């Protein structure tokens, strides 16, 4: 789960992290009122969407030379003008795709006199089971280019959660940022505060870009992104309350109601699989055969008729889907139960696109018999490779 920048900053402030003053706004009038409450005379107007690259983004409805989603205003009047241009319009960034995201809220912050920009993030390193702090002296809008062109400018400090954050970790962060004296102490303190928040809130990712050094010698968190482990949200009702469903794909929201893991992609072949690893392998082999998956959909280990029907409905809501590949390995789930669910779901949704089904595992023959006797044009497959070839052929035949 993701939250907006202003929400992330409110959470971090509870852990003592220094952030510039700022107020969220849903209307032009609220943006103007927010600016009037800030010291000024400089203000920053920020579009609030769940995507990075806002500063370099472009609004679909505005001229090509118009400014992006993060703008410096030198007066209250400019704040008003920027708010009018941004609210309700579609911001396209490197992370949104061509469709972009509509800007429904803004964050108006006090201007900061910046001397230097740094980068700091924390992620769960799944390979080691530890928290990795990633830092760079090259913070700002071009951090992706830095990571690609000059990876030596990025340093990683790994923390064993059993040990926790120790003073030497803080010093390592400061040294990696080439800081000394009071600034090094500030960096160490901020890193510790961020780590405490990261662990306490069950974050999966926390990114500060940029962490800025001001002209008067202070370190401030200027922009932040936070993502949370969805499996731990039951422990954080305060975080769940921050969820903005308008920023999420409606199909993904619907899928979550049935405990389905669904992610929309840009292809034309819908996938329904049990198990994340098998789902990724299925998507890979579809691409290997020349087409592209329309989604990632893991029905999990306890799929029933209701879940399978919901999965079909969610897949078919995507108009780009021209065929569906079902790939099920029956371990805990029995293939005959899944087959019954597939047949019932296909009848209920009046399936009109090609459907290829590959079953393997417990009660596989019973499952295949149910599909064969269903009276539906379901194409059986013997293995994963056969399934991929058949669904690609079926989709191309009706194209």
From Swiss-Prot:
Substrate binds at residues 274, 331-333. One of its GO terms (molecular function) is succinate-CoA ligase (ADP-forming) activity. PROSITE patterns: ATP_GRASP (PS50975), SUCCINYL_COA_LIG_3 (PS01217). It is an enzyme of class 6 (ligase). Belongs to the succinate/malate CoA ligase beta subunit family. The gene is sucC. This is Succinate--CoA ligase [ADP-forming] subunit beta. Mg(2+) binds at residues 209, 223. It comes from Novosphingobium aromaticivorans (strain ATCC 700278 / DSM 12444 / CCUG 56034 / CIP 105152 / NBRC 16084 / F199).
């Amino acid at each position: 789960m993701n939250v907006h920048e202003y929400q992330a900053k409110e959470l971090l402030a509870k852990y003592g992290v220094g952030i510039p003053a700022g107020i969220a706004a849903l209307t032009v009038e609220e943006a103007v009122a927010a600016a009037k409450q800030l010291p000024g005379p400089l203000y920053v107007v920020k579009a609030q969407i769940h995507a990075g690259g806002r500063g370099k983004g472009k609004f679909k409805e505005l001229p090509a030379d118009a400014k992006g989603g993060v703008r410096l205003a030198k007066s209250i009047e400019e704040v008003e003008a920027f708010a009018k241009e941004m609210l309700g319009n579609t911001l396209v960034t490197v992370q949104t795709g061509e469709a972009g995201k509509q800007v429904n809220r803004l964050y108006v912050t006090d201007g900061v006199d910046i001397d230097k920009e740094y980068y700091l993030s924390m992620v769960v390193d799944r390979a080691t089971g530890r928290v990795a702090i990633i830092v760079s002296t090259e913070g700002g809008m071009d951090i992706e280019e830095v990571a690609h062109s000059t990876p030596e400018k990025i340093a990683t400090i790994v923390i064993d959660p059993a040990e926790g954050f120790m003073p030497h970790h803080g010093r390592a962060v400061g040294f990696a940022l080439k800081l000394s004296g009071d600034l090094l102490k500030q960096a160490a303190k901020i890193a510790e505060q961020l780590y405490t928040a990261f662990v306490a809130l069950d974050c999966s990712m926390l990114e500060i870009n940029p962490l800025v050094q001001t002209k008067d010698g202070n370190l401030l968190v200027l922009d932040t992104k936070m993502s949370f482990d969805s499996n731990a949200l039951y422990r954080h009702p305060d975080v769940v309350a921050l969820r903005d469903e308008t920023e999420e794909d409606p199909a993904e929201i619907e899928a979550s109601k049935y405990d389905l893991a669904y992610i929309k992609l840009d292809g034309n072949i819908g996938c329904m699989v049990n198990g994340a690893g098998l789902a990724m392998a299925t998507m890979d082999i579809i691409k290997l055969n020349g087409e592209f998956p329309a989604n990632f959909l893991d029905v999990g280990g306890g799929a029933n008729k209701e879940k399978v029907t919901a999965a079909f409905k969610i897949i078919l809501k995507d108009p780009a889907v021209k065929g569906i590949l079902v790939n099920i390995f029956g371990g805990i789930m029995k293939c005959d139960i899944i087959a019954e669910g597939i047949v019932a779901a296909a009848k209920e949704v009046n399936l009109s696109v090609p459907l290829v089904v590959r079953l393997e595992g417990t009660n596989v023959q019973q499952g295949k018999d149910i599909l064969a006797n269903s009276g539906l044009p379901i194409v059986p497959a013997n293995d994963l490779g056969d399934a991929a070839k058949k669904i690609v052929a079926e989709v191309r035949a009706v194209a």
